[in-house]
Amino acid sequence: MTAAVLVLTGVALVLAVVAWVPKSGATLEIVLSGVMLACLTATGILLLAGHGVQGWREAWWNILLMVSGGLAVAGGGPLTTSVLALVDRGNTRSQSTQQAGEVLRGGALIGALERGAIYGSIVAGWPEGIAIVLAIKGLARYPELRSPDQPASVTPTAVAERFIIGTFTSVLWAVTCAGLLLSR
């Protein structure tokens, strides 16, 4: 098992270095990043299910912990997008709210990082981490929420609505994934 962990970690490291070579967003970079993530996941599963684990129940629990974390991070994006689409559908200012997404660039990536940090802090037994994650996000986004340089078709209210609804949906998803797992 040690050899498998070392090989997977080495492959992930090589791919990480090679991924810096292509231009940002290139197909090769995306493929390398995906394979690198798969190597990291396989390494984590091997480590969590391997030596030092007391019995099959603990091994499966560790794997479930990791899979649930992946669901918290990856599943929250489509859910948040769907909730925002539902909000926009019933909104008379739909165009303004949709264009607010252009003001809040990087929201999908920030949301994934946010969900990962929240899931990790809850599973680690440190729920105070939620407050820290939300404070960092709020402070980082504050200039965009209050900027007078927004396009004329986007109101500050629409940007704030999108930020609040997206954040709450994202956080509730991560908390739900962690809470259901820990409710056993």
Predicted regions and their residues:
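Multi-pass alpha-helical transmembrane bundle typical of ion/small-solute transporters
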Residues: 1-130, 135-184
